């Protein structure tokens, strides 16, 4: 631990060693990496931390999720790191510390934002730059004057999401509507809590192929490849989408899809390659990747939804989010896979104001700007989510979280929160969308926020 920076070392010689060292010579090193410690070392109560397990067991019993990872670190010391449950409800494969989860929108703050901060550090843009300065297709649209900071604060007015997949469906392959608010013969498949869909449609053969071939290299799922020209459809759909009120809070995945495009243009490389080369590989985050099947065994990856609508298969190693899938799995809004141990290294980097393991990855000034800024009209930070003052159902955090906390949640059942006041990290990763996204018990039971409050009670 000492050699790799997991613990600090302080020591002096009380006597001289002839020809080598004089009395008083010593070694003094700082703790630069996360390491495992007993809760008592940070004055946390082990008994109160045990409450976490009871909250998780409640969620497992009520089938809010089949399994999860929970991670807590304080003062750079890991005081809680446990895996619970299974990959799915068949209970054949138990979750362990190496299990990898689809982070969903937590990717925005753990992946895309990391790349955005690096580009900002390198002076590739300013917060007041117009996004159309980097994406010229938007120059002759009503999106031309949107500032980069508007996208980061989610106050651009852009629509929450766009169903890009509709452009790949053959409209002549079915009759009637694709969606229904009630289950019937034409709409037998439940899509979410309020929507049923048909599954008798076909994809346009000039856009979707069952095998990889020239022109069809964008992988959506197993045996599904999208024509490479579809990226032009995506930017056109964004350009033509309805724009709401600028300056008013409206959470939008489109904001981060555009930020990813900006980063790739300014940094002159794909975002996944940038993040791997500049951050994940150096941090030792070997289980963190977009399109994880390129580097990890399928058996390490926790499945998300059994998709009976678009991809018609169990999604395992392929991103759950449809908008990200139709961009080949690397998107600004979703696509990153990781486990709690890997993710903690990124979060500790944020908490350390840009450094980890003795290396400075981002400037302190950039880290302070992005982690401390807050939008005037709402709770959002610069790319990060934050608590609502006073807590309550409107807040993504527990009632005991201070205002300084920043982090994000993910649709698949994930969250992470960084607390600079208490030098604290909290990570919860689950696959609550397995086997269906219609299950929202994770939210209704307040599992993530109850765990967060239990952590604060344990460290007080």
Residue ranges with predicted function:
Residues 144-404:
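Short, surface-exposed loop or secondary-structure junction motifs
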Residues 57-58, 100, 370, 400-406, ...:
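Short, P/G- and charge-enriched loop/turn segments at secondary-structure junctions
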Residues 81-84, 161-167, 290-292, 429, ...:
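Short, solvent-exposed loop/turn and secondary-structure capping segments
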């Amino acid at each position: 631990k000492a050699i790799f920076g997991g613990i600090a070392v302080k020591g002096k010689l009380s006597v001289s060693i002839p020809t080598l060292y004089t009395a008083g010579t010593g070694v003094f090193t700082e703790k630069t990496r996360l390491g495992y410690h007993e809760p008592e070392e940070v004055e946390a109560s082990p008994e109160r931390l045990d409450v976490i397990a009871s909250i998780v067991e409640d969620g497992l019993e009520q089938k809010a999720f089949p399994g999860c990872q929970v991670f807590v670190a304080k003062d750079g010391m890991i005081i809680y790191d446990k895996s619970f449950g299974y990959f799915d409800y068949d209970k054949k494969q138990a979750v362990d510390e190496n299990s990898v989860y689809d982070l969903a929108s937590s990717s925005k703050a753990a992946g895309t934002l990391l790349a955005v901060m690096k580009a900002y550090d390198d002076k590739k843009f300013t917060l007041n730059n117009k996004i159309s300065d980097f994406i010229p297709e938007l120059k002759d649209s009503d999106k031309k004057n949107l500032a980069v900071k508007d996208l980061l604060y989610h106050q651009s007015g852009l629509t929450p999401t766009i169903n890009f997949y509709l452009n790949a469906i053959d409209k002549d392959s079915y009759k009637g509507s694709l969606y229904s608010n009630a289950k019937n013969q034409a709409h037998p498949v439940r899509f979410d809590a309020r929507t049923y869909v048909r599954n008798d449609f076909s994809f346009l053969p000039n856009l979707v192929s069952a095998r990889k071939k020239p022109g069809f290299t964008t992988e959506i799922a197993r045996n599904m490849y999208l024509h490479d020209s579809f990226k032009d459809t995506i930017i056109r759909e964004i350009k033509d989408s309805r724009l709401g009120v600028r300056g008013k809070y409206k959470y939008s995945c489109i904001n981060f899809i555009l930020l990813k495009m900006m980063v790739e243009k300014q940094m002159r490389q794909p975002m996944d390659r940038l993040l791997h080369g500049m951050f994940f590989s150096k941090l030792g985050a070997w289980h963190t990747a977009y399109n994880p099947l390129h580097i990890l065994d399928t058996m390490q990856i926790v499945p998300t939804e059994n998709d009976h609508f678009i991809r018609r298969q169990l999604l395992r190693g392929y991103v759950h989010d449809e908008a990200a899938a139709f961009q080949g799995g690397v998107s600004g809004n979703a696509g990153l896979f990781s486990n709690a141990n890997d993710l903690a290294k990124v979060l500790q980097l944020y908490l350390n104001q840009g450094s980890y393991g003795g290396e400075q990855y981002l400037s302190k000034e950039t880290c302070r700007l992005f982690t401390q800024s807050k939008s005037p009209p709402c709770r959002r930070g610069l790319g990060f989510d934050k608590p609502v003052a006073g807590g309550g159902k409107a807040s993504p955090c527990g009632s005991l979280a201070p205002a300084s906390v920043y982090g994000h949640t993910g649709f698949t059942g994930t969250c992470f929160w960084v607390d600079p006041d208490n030098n604290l990290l909290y990570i919860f990763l689950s696959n609550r969308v397995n086997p269906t996204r219609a299950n929202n018990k994770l939210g209704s039971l307040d599992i993530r926020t109850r765990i967060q409050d239990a952590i604060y009670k344990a460290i007080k």
